[in-house]
Swiss-Prot record:
It comes from Bos taurus. Its EC number is 1.-.-.-. It is an enzyme of class 1 (oxidoreductase). This is Saccharopine dehydrogenase-like oxidoreductase. The gene is SCCPDH. One of its GO terms (cellular component) is membrane. One of its GO terms (biological process) is glycolipid biosynthetic process.
Length: 429
């Protein structure tokens, strides 16, 4: 992608937010990466110069780079001020948007980026926002030749590219995949910043509008190849991983389905069915999550209930979410593993009347999911936009990560930066 002689190749918008601080650190690492062959001019953007400077100073101390603050531009920008968003977009080739919940704050950034010929990457895990932005802005982005790529953090690059990786590694036709997410933590346990909790509360509280949006889109169904993938019970046991699991309620399924539609309709690839689950451990964890889930699903239906869920986040989430977010010790001790079980047909075997005769198991592993892996994924996606434009879809538009990056070297870059893709087993039966 041409940098268009703009002052900054990258601008991190919302750099002083909880997630934005991690993205800022990751861009700073990329700036001095031994692999870089050219200078990476970049900036941070937000409402407060003082807060942005503090973020840069903390990153400088952590990375041992005392001159970092003087190397990075600062742009004062407010989500409620469209003119300031325009000024930010005009100075960037790619904006990394870290300001959420995106259902409230994401659209003005996308609009400003498209109008000013700037590409944009976000880390939204909100299906309604992601799908609505496609319908509203895909054609406009294509006309401008810019790339708007959502869900480019832990939601949903590991899942979306994990399915593509599994397809690429199968010697035949992949027809169905189940993924199982395992989150590991240290002695201090897990914690997630309440921004993620708020996005979930608002998303579940507005599910009817997502259903309405999908009905109005009136898209023809993607064909099912091979046997239809059976959905598991709300609580099921995964023998291969020796753990109980529940359906994963994030954006992964929505994103992967949209990617598979794109690959089928635009690249004539055989579509893959997909289901996502998260491992919750033993029966004690199952009972605890059942209570938390029942409370959540009851209260999220009502306006006052949503207010209570947001006001008393720590209580209703059983301590998994907090306004302070995880400590550095919790982050350092956390990691994730996403295991993919795929099935399909070897070359020459028709999926019409036969049973699947190939099984494949792959994994994506990485450091702490919500902030460390998210930052790595987001920044490496931006590097692809800047450096590998020839492998992107020829026209711009609004894309899922898989649709945008399926033919790029993003998986290779992620492997080099600590998010590892691997084949565990592959058998023909």
């Amino acid at each position: 992608m041409a940098t268009q002689q703009r002052p900054f190749h990258l601008v991190v918008f919302g750099a002083s937010g909880f997630t934005g601080q991690f993205v800022t650190e990751e861009v700073a690492r990329e700036q001095v990466s031994p692999e870089r062959t050219s200078h990476l001019p970049w900036a941070v953007a937000g409402r407060s110069r003082e807060k942005l400077l503090r973020v840069l100073e903390r990153a400088a101390m952590k990375l041992g780079r005392p001159t970092l603050s003087s190397e990075v531009g600062i742009i004062i920008c407010d989500i409620t001020n469209p003119a300031s968003l325009d000024e930010m977009a005009k100075q960037a080739t790619v904006v990394l948007n870290c300001v959420g919940p995106y259902r409230f704050y994401g659209e003005p950034v996308i609009k400003a980026c498209i109008e000013n010929g700037t590409s944009c990457i976000d880390i939204s895990g909100e299906p309604q926002f992601l799908e609505l932005m496609y319908w509203k802005y895909h054609e406009k982005a294509a006309e401008k030749g810019v790339y708007i790529i959502g869900s480019s953090g832990f939601d949903s690059i590991p899942a979306d590219l994990g399915v593509i990786y599994t397809r690429n590694k199968m010697n035949g036709t992949l027809t169905a995949v189940e993924s199982f997410l395992t989150i590991s933590s240290g002695p201090e346990g897990l914690c997630v910043h309440d921004g993620t909790w708020k996005s979930a509360v608002y998303g579940f509280g507005d599910k009817s509008n997502l259903k309405k949006l999908r009905n109005e889109s009136d898209m023809k169904p993607v064909p099912i190849v091979g046997p239809k993938l059976k959905r598991r019970w709300p609580i099921s046991y995964c023998r291969e991983l020796n753990s109980y699991s529940i359906p994963f309620l994030g954006a992964d399924v929505s994103v992967v389905k949209r990617t598979q539609r794109y690959l089928h309709e635009n690249l004539e690839q055989s579509p893959v069915q997909y289901a996502a689950y998260i491992n919750v451990g033993g029966i004690t964890s199952v009972i605890k999550l059942m209570f938390a889930g029942l409370f959540f699903l009851f209260f999220v239906r009502f306006g006052i209930g949503r207010q209570l869920l947001i006001k008393f986040t720590w209580l209703f989430s059983f301590g998994y979410f907090s306004k302070q977010g995880p400590t550095q010790k919790q982050i350092d001790a956390s990691s994730f593993t996403m295991t993919f079980f795929g099935q399909g047909f070897s070359q020459g075997v028709s999926p019409v009347k036969n049973k699947p005769n190939i099984r494949i198991c792959t994994q994506v592993k990485g450091p702490e999911a919500g902030y460390v892996s998210t930052s790595i994924a987001m920044v490496q996606a931006a590097m692809i936009l800047l450096n590998d434009a020839s492998d992107l879809p020829k026209a711009g538009g609004v894309f899922t990560p898989g649709a945008a990056f399926s033919r790029t070297k993003l998986i290779d870059r992620l492997n080099e930066h600590g998010i590892e893709f691997s084949v565990i087993s592959s058998t023909e039966v």
